């Protein structure tokens, strides 16, 4: 989840990569208003930190193809599936190249063999399309 957050931030603020894959991330820190990672202040105490740390707020800067993957039943309080859904809708609405894959019945960590195989297939297809031979 933190890796997904970092991927989204890197892609929004650089042109170093040909494509990205982000799984089960928290893209809008205002949806976790009572702290995240080492940030102990609430949203109301440090709104600019929450805004600036949120890839969602910088969706208009996304120029790199981004594959988003999320478990439909993710019950981690910082990474509910709406994080990926809203981020995807923002990216798509702004014309970014993106795809959202929701894994049925999966939580924050994916367990079903079918889900893992599908995840690997999606990632392979994405990398073949946007990275291979570039």
Task: Walk through the language-model features, giving the residues of each.
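Active-site-proximal cap/loop segments of hydrolase catalytic domains
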Residues: 1-134
């Amino acid at each position: 989840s933190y890796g997904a957050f970092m991927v989204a931030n890197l892609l929004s603020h650089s042109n170093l990569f040909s494509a990205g894959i982000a799984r089960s991330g928290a893209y809008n820190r205002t949806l976790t208003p009572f702290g995240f990672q080492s940030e102990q202040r609430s949203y109301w105490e440090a709104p600019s930190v929450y805004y600036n740390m949120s890839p969602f707020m910088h969706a208009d800067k996304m120029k790199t193809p981004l594959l988003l993957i999320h478990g439909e039943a993710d019950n981690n309080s910082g990474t509910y599936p709406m994080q990926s859904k809203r981020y995807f809708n923002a990216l798509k609405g702004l014309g970014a190249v993106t795809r959202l894959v929701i894994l049925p019945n999966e939580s924050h960590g994916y367990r079903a063999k079918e889900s893992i195989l599908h995840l690997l297939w999606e990632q392979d297809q994405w990398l073949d399309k946007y990275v291979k031979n570039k």
